A protein has these predicted regions:
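Conserved structured core elements
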Residues: 96, 108, 120-127, 152, ...
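Conserved beta-loop-beta/alpha segment of the NTase-like Rossmann-fold superfamily
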Residues: 167, 172-271
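N-terminal glycine-rich phosphate-binding loop and ensuing alpha1 helix
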Residues: 5-176, 184, 195-204, 208-211, ...
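Fold-independent oxyanion-binding glycine-rich loops
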Residues: 100, 151-152, 180-181, 216-217, ...
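Catalytic core of tubulin tyrosine ligase-like
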Residues: 227-232, 240-244, 249-409
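Hydrophobic/aromatic beta-strand patches that form the interior of the parallel beta-sheet core
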Residues: 96, 115, 147, 176-178, ...
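N-terminal glycine-rich, Lys/His-bearing helix-loop that initiates the first secondary-structure elements
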Residues: 1-3
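Short acidic, glycine/serine/threonine-rich loops at helix termini
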Residues: 107-110, 157-163, 187-192, 243-247, ...
Length: 410
């Protein structure tokens, strides 16, 4: 049963957003239903955050969090891997692919995962990731549930593409799609913008919104039904990463941690990656732009840099603990952005400078609400080939070079 106009007015009045129905009388039936659906699914309680913007940005006391380094991992590889394989065979591990983005920065109008990195034959980003996951499926002789998070913009294209390619050999019964929730975009007073007469201006709810999006899309029913206890969440733009890596899973389980985070040794103290740390004694990530010179040059007891391990957006979460933090409110990040909007005359304006706020929740806040986290070092040139740009650093070019180095035929 969808929301009625009266219910929508009631909800809007509660948050002082009645203006979004200004053009309701001009809309056709389909558009009316569209805006009512949007009003129903939009979390407006977050708009209160504008009033407390300053409190949200405060960081606590930052101290180092030691990573499990390669030598310790190698010494225990067999044991860790056996534990991880056992968990996979028991159906306790699932993977979540964050694939809501478009390939815009690569000059493509398609979903990011549809980008072709091949040279002599087609090799798509989705294909690279599924191939990597298939290696574990063969190793464990067991299928792993793969949840794919799409967005409003790319959902249909993503599903059609993967079906057309027969999921690159993956068992379709183990692939589940869900859409990332959207958060409203507002002016500086916290009033929601309209992007069309029948459409609120919205943007994805940040990389920390994936679990609540799973929940609201009914995916947790599958998680509970299948007895899934661990979720490995990873981003679409790193074509070399190991997914549902048994050694990583086993190490996290054996160390009794509720989160594992794959990390790489930084290639320079000022490299633009977030760094694992403790904040007020709890696991956290300090973003590269928050690292002071003092932190950047701090040393641990061995004389090594204390904040030396960058995160690569590949995390293993314990489901039970994720559900616990979902009962609490996730902290919000308020980001100033340029937001296209309808002006008083109903004309679309595309601003050249920031004119409002978008609201995001971030993975680092999920980690900070957890009691323990294992930073797990991986070899950079074997597991980290991010594609953020067309050329240069972290680009299609650099990823092709790394794929070739790792024996992938392009």
């Amino acid at each position: 049963m969808s929301m009625t106009l009266e219910q929508a007015k009631e909800k809007l009045a509660k948050y002082g957003q009645e203006h979004v129905l200004k053009y309701y009388g001009e809309l056709n039936e389909e558009e009316k239903q569209g805006i009512l659906d949007q009003i129903e699914t939009t979390d407006m309680s977050i708009l209160e955050a504008c009033k407390h913007k300053e409190d949200l940005a405060k960081k606590g006391v930052i101290t180092p969090l030691a990573a499990m380094q390669l030598d310790e991992i190698e010494a225990n590889r067999e044991e860790f891997t056996a534990t991880g394989i056992e968990a996979i065979r028991q159906g306790k591990v699932a993977a979540v692919l964050l694939a809501g983005g478009m390939g815009t920065r690569l000059g493509s109008d398609n979903p990011m995962g549809m980008y072709n990195v091949g040279l002599t034959h087609e090799l798509y980003i989705f294909e690279c990731l599924i191939n990597n996951l298939m290696e574990v499926v063969h190793q464990a002789d067991s299928w792993i549930h793969l949840f794919v998070m799409t967005s409003d913009k790319n959902n249909d294209a993503t599903i059609a593409f993967l079906k057309e390619h027969d999921f690159f050999g993956y068992n379709a019964e183990y692939v589940h799609f869900f859409k990332q929730e959207m958060a409203a975009a507002t002016d500086y007073e916290g009033k929601i913008y309209l992007e069309e007469k029948g459409k609120l201006s919205t943007s994805p709810n940040g990389n920390g919104g994936w679990f609540i999006s799973m929940k609201n899309n009914g995916m947790l029913d599958i998680v509970h039904r299948e007895g899934i206890e661990w979720i490995n969440v990873f981003a679409v733009d790193n074509v070399l990463q190991r997914i549902a890596d048994p050694c990583f899973i086993g190490a996290t389980i054996q160390k009794n941690c509720v989160v594992g985070s794959k990390v790489v040794r930084k290639n320079a103290p000022d490299e633009k990656v977030g760094v694992m740390c403790l904040e007020d004694g709890r696991p956290s990530i300090v973003e590269y732009y928050e690292l002071t010179d003092e932190l950047m040059n701090a040393k641990d007891e061995k004389g090594e840099p204390a904040y030396n391990y960058g995160v690569i957006l590949n995390y293993l979460f314990k489901v039970q603990d994720l559900e616990k933090i979902m009962a609490e409110k996730m902290p919000l990040h308020i980001v100033e952005k340029k937001i296209p909007y309808l002006d008083a005359a109903g004309e679309l304006v595309k601003p050249d400078t920031p004119n409002g706020y978008k609201f995001e929740s971030l993975v680092l806040d999920m980690i900070h609400q957890m009691d323990s986290c294992l930073p797990f070092e991986v070899v950079r040139r074997k597991e980290f080939a991010p594609i953020k740009n067309k050329t240069g650093v972290d680009s299609v070019e650099s990823a092709r070079e790394l794929l070739t180095e790792n024996g992938v035929v392009l």
